[in-house]
């Protein structure tokens, strides 16, 4: 079952442009990941592979701040605060997951076990389920 763009915007709370930025980051990340795993670029570190995701998170945070300020100026204070809170929560959990995964791939430490690394994703999925029930 595929979701329409309207449903994705409604459930995720992101604007269409933000979804496009994250999909573009996923495409660039996939290319860099394939290059890194195949060993075609020996100087490419895991931190460089994850740069598209970090850039997309930064651009999305910047865009959300601008939209929230504009909503606040237009008198939509409640909507501005709720949107800012929701999107920053989603982006923070995504960013923590990316940082922990990248650190695990670089250092290969035993202190970072995969249950700890994926815990932000599970929290995010629970929040998305709650939001999906509230939206409908």
Swiss-Prot record:
CDD domains per UniProt: TMEM203 (cd22816)
Cellular component annotations (GO), alphabetically ordered: endoplasmic reticulum; endoplasmic reticulum membrane; endoplasmic reticulum-Golgi intermediate compartment; lysosomal membrane
Region Required for lysosomal localization of the STING-TMEM203 complex, residue ranges: 52-136
Keyword entries, A-Z: Endoplasmic reticulum, Lysosome, Membrane, Transmembrane, Transmembrane helix
Reported phenotype of the disruption mutant: Male mutants are sterile and exhibit a profound defect in spermatogenesis and spermagiogenesis.
Topological relation to the membrane, as annotated: Multi-pass membrane protein
Residues spanning the membrane: 14-34, 50-72, 81-101, 112-132
Main location: endoplasmic reticulum
Subunit structure: Homodimer. Interacts with ATP2A2 and ITPR3. Interacts with STIM1 and STING1 (via transmembrane domain).
Protein name as annotated: Transmembrane protein 203
Species of origin: Mus musculus
């Amino acid at each position: 079952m595929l979701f329409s763009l309207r449903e994705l915007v409604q459930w995720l709370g992101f604007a269409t442009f933000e979804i496009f930025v994250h999909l573009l980051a996923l495409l660039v990340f996939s290319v860099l990941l394939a290059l890194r795993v195949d060993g075609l670029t020996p100087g490419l570190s895991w931190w460089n592979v994850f740069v598209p995701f970090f850039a997309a998170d930064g651009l999305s945070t910047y865009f959300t701040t601008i939209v929230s300020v504009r909503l606040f100026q237009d008198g939509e204070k409640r909507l501005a605060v709720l949107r800012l809170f929701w999107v920053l929560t989603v982006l923070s959990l995504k960013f923590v997951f990316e940082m922990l995964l990248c650190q695990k791939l670089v250092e290969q430490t035993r202190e970072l076990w995969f249950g700890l690394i994926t815990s932000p994703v599970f929290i995010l999925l629970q929040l998305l389920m709650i939001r999906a029930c509230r939206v409908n």
